[in-house]
Amino acid sequence: MTQLTREQVLELFHQRSSTRYYDPTKKISDEDFECILECGRLSPSSVGSEPWKFLVIQNKTLREKMKPFSWGMINQLDNCSHLVVILAKKNARYDSPFFVDVMARKGLNAEQQQAALTKYKALQEEDMKLLENDRTLFDWCSKQTYIALANMLTGASALGIDSCPIEGFHYDKMNECLAEEGLFDPQEYAVSVAATFGYRSRDIAKKSRKGLDEVVKWVG
């Protein structure tokens, strides 16, 4: 694999900018979008939990149903090439069947599984206090989905594809709408965040960011 230069890496991030208006005549190829999804699937997550699912919503009727409560992507639902809604796992306790599957994927033997469970219990109960209420535990899983989201956005930029991460919608109504469509079990998952992908239809103003010296503090 040819290694990118530092300049090429940074160019991907300068090039990526939240796209509000897409060209509806330009569609992402199946191969390119599968690559973007793989960027999400291959992302890291806390204790390798992978507490996410990716809903790729291409159905125009469903997108239309989403408009009344999706103010943050009202201009994009008609014109973006692809829409992804990322779900986060609910009730991902260390002693749940979900974590049994996590350990099975890792190929752990019985002794290793018990050691892992002990660590997961300490993490959730003591280190992060995730078991205080259902929302705290869900938010932990939701944080993991943002790692996958970021990698999908950067992967898209590497392919010359534009994107926009979106939180601008009514979460209860979005959950209700998608669950009623049978897209997920609301007892097991809930909406975390969304993103649109496609090709921009107009120029985007140069992004403004804080200087490196404002956000970085070296210690030692």
UniProtKB/Swiss-Prot annotation:
Signal sequence, start to end: none
Enzyme class: oxidoreductase
Cellular component terms per the entry's GO annotation: cytosol
UniProt xrefs under Gene3D superfamilies: NADH Oxidase
Cofactor(s) recorded in Swiss-Prot or TrEMBL: FMN
Native source organism of the sequence: Haemophilus influenzae (strain ATCC 51907 / DSM 11121 / KW20 / Rd)
Residues noted as binding NAD(+) in the record, renumbered to the chain: G155, A156, S157, A158, L159, G160
InterPro entries according to UniProt: NfsB-like (IPR033878), Nitroreductase (IPR029479), Nitroreductase-like (IPR000415), Nitroreductase/BluB (IPR050627)
SUPFAM superfamilies associated with the record: FMN-dependent nitroreductase-like
Family according to the record: Belongs to the nitroreductase family.
Domain of life: Bacteria
Biological processes, Gene Ontology terms: 2,4,6-trinitrotoluene catabolic process
The entry's keywords: Flavoprotein, FMN, NAD, NADP, Oxidoreductase
CDD domains: NfsB-like
Entry EC no(s): 1.-.-.-
Name of this protein: Putative NAD(P)H nitroreductase
GO molecular function, one term: oxidoreductase activity
